[in-house]
Amino acid sequence: MLNYTGLENKDVLVVGLAKSGYEAAKLLIKLGANVTVNDGKDLSQDPHAKDLEALGVKIVDGGHPLSLLDNEPIIVKNPGIPYTVSIIQEAYQRHLKILTEVELSYLISEAPIIAITGTNGKTTTSSLIGDMFKKSRLTGRLSGNIGYVASKVAQETSPNEYLITELSSFQLLGVEQYRPHIAIITNIYSAHLDYHETLENYQNAKKQIYKNQTENDYLICNYHQRHLIESENLKAKTLYFSTQQEVDGIYIKDGFIVYQGIRIINIDDLVLPGEHNLENILAAVLASILAGVPIKAIIDSLTTFSGIDHRLQYIGTNRTNKYYNDSKATNTLATQFALNSFKQPIVWLCGGLDRGNDFDELIPYMKNVRVMVVFGQTQEKFAKLGNSQGKLVVKATDIEDAVKKVQDVVEPNDVVLLSPACASWDQYKTFEERGERFIESFRAHLPSY
């Protein structure tokens, strides 16, 4: 951790506890600050609040009294606290310094940063970069919106390691000095307008990621959204990714991922499915190359990376059949997305809690479905759907039985996909439990194990 003295003996008000507020408060104590934590909820039984009180932190809960601003503290804002909260608005009116927890992580670390933001794909891209580092001899530590508090991870990261930080628009809003060496914008679409009010405000929040970059830094973005990048404010070297054409950066040509004219890998050898994931993969490969990850480690990652748990997660191959766990698909929209991700014939495992809906909206996405293995309360509805489309329908009692029956109908090169399009509660407590049962059954029933 950098020996940062800018907060020593300063009054600091942390607004919002949760995980990031808790870690920020502990860090601020280490940095010699006089710390108060304020949260609108009752924290009288909160173990984190009790821990902080034992360290000398003052806790003010149950509201946001404006009197907390009377001693003109520096504000550290939890990303979950909107800027519209009265105490933050008043702090702006009084021209008080407001830091975000991510900004704090930057101030106390000399580690180079790969920062990833975007409306979609940022978690997959961040995780894939982390896996590429793991496959090499380099160290990259995941942090930020992906679930590891940035200010905590930053303390553990040395200058010769990378911080790989996923950033939401909420975290980027408060950027002042934050400067990643490599910044990625996966894409920008309309989202979180309840928070940002306008699309322009949301886009501007995302653009904060390159606000402080210099000509020694890199910005990686989607070539087909390059019009969203403001060139007049951009100093970093801009590189692009595209699945459709050659660009200055990384692209797909003749079925290969290509960087600077060099073929890296055939896309048929990737285990992460879907056109959307091709863009995530390109961004991750380019960032990892720029950070010095060897091509061999990148290829190793691309041929083994299973994705995010229960979200089109690759769980293994038996003979020529790849198996994917998409248990998080608890509605038809998510399953449409999954069915559209494969060009190969699909053995589709589906069914679950009956909420009274039919599934006809899935019909346009079923062209590659060869077999349906149906279970749960919606078994008969899915059987009727499959029969109406001329699919082979097999009935199973549960996930375990479904995996067993797959063995009787699967053909070479079929993809086996669990994407239930239903909640799990008829048979399993959570979609995670359902997905784990699928993985366990795959391992238990298949001869390769």
Curated annotation (Swiss-Prot):
Signal peptide: none annotated. It holds the Pfam family MurD-like_N. It comes from the Bacteria. ATP binds at residues 118-124. Disulfide bonds: none annotated. HAMAP family: MurD (MF_00639). This is UDP-N-acetylmuramoylalanine--D-glutamate ligase. It comes from Staphylococcus haemolyticus (strain JCSC1435). The gene is murD.
